[in-house]
């Protein structure tokens, strides 16, 4: 975070310092550039902002100003990369892809480079020195660094090819809603980022070199870049929506599986509930059995108590009334021995007399 904040502060300082430098360079360019240069540059087609590169004078002051401008542009590019954040990784990936382009594109770009090369050898030498100086911060963006004017068409051609490929691939991807996005589309998106980031550098140099004459052309080249920038987020949003739409069923399937799995825990909970209920019922049964046993035991115990109490009472009464009981038993025996004679017995005696 601290590094990014420092880069932002540097970019703000450079942005404030650039207008004054641009004015000075524009005045010096108007005074030193030959009158035929703007006509040549305006007559040549400008397909992209990367092709807008002008010749420079052979004086030492022009080269110093070029180096200063390039240093400032590199600082601005670094700040823009720091602000872009995660796009840097994608641009690095796209740069690696652009380095792997076939040799046919290099041959075609060299053929397109011939009409753009200047006629004067002095201007060629100055262009070579300027491109070699600029090749250090910006070289490697479009394959192997080439000195002289050959670096211009390679950058421009690579930008054209990447823009065409990106346009076709994004249209095809939008027409065909697929769940997986091919790496070509990713490279096309990153290739779109390239001209916008690369385009910032040559537009700044074109203003310093050609002055007022190329200001309109650079503005015109910036307009499609803005349009590309505005179209990029819309295409990115559409592709993101397609990706989300494609990933929704994929995400829904695990959700459905989770929903299917949810009855499992609920069923297990029900089983646990039934187990707990059965355990409770068993405990109740055991408690009832134990209570029944205790109640039976208690009932038997009370029966034993009652019988014991009755026996104690009988024994107590018998013990206290033993004399009466003995007398009653003995009287019965005595009565049997000494019983009274009956009337019949008396009648028999009288008859005998």
From Swiss-Prot:
Also found in strains BALB/c, C57BL/6 and DBA/2. Disulfide bonds: none annotated. Residues 29-57, 265-278 have a biased composition (Polar residues). Glycans are attached at residues 110, 293. The chain crosses the membrane at residues 299-319. Coiled coil: none annotated. It holds the Pfam family KCT2. It comes from Mus musculus. It is found in: Cell membrane; Golgi apparatus, trans-Golgi network membrane. The gene is Tgoln1. Sequence repeats lie at residues 131-138, 139-146, 147-154, 155-162, 163-170, 171-178. A motif (Endocytosis signal) lies at residues 346-349. Residues 137-150 have a biased composition (Gly residues). GO terms for cellular component: endosome; Golgi apparatus; plasma membrane; trans-Golgi network. Residues 131-178 are annotated as: 6 X 8 AA tandem repeats. This is Trans-Golgi network integral membrane protein 1. Residues 320-353 are cytoplasmic. Widely expressed.
């Amino acid at each position: 975070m601290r590094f990014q904040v420092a880069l932002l502060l540097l970019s703000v300082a450079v942005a404030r310092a650039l207008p004054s430098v641009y004015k000075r360079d524009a005045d010096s360019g108007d005074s030193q550039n030959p009158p035929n240069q703007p006509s040549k540059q305006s007559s040549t087609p400008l397909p992209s902002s990367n092709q807008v590169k002008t010749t420079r004078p052979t004086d030492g002051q022009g080269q110093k100003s070029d180096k200063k401008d390039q240093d400032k542009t590199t600082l601005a590019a670094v700040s823009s990369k720091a602000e872009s954040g995660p796009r840097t990784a994608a641009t690095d990936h796209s740069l690696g892809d652009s380095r792997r382009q076939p040799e046919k594109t290099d041959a075609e770009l060299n053929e397109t480079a011939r009409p753009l090369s200047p006629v004067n050898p002095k201007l060629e030498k100055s262009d070579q020195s300027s491109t070699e100086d600029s090749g250090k911060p910006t070289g490697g963006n479009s394959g192997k660094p080439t000195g002289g004017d050959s670096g211009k068409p390679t950058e421009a051609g690579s930008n054209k090819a990447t823009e065409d490929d990106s346009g076709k691939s994004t249209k095809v991807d939008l027409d065909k809603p697929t769940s997986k996005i091919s790496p070509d589309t990713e490279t096309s998106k990153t290739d779109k980022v390239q001209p916008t980031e690369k385009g910032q550098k040559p537009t700044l140099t074109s203003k310093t070199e050609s002055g007022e004459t190329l200001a309109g052309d650079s503005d015109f080249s910036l307009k499609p870049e803005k349009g590309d920038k505005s179209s990029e987020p819309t295409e990115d949003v559409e592709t993101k929506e397609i990706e989300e739409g494609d990933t929704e069923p994929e995400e829904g399937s695990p959700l459905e599986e989770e929903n299917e799995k949810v009855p499992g825990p609920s069923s297990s909970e029900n089983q646990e509930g039934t187990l707990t209920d059965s355990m409770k019922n068993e405990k109740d049964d055991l408690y009832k059995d134990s209570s029944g046993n205790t109640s039976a035991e208690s009932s038997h115990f009370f029966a034993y108590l009652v019988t014991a109490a009755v026996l104690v009472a009988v024994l107590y009464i018998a013990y206290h009334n033993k004399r009466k009981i003995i007398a009653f038993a003995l009287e019965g025996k005595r009565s049997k021995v000494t019983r009274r004679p009956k009337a019949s017995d008396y009648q028999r005696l009288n008859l005998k007399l």
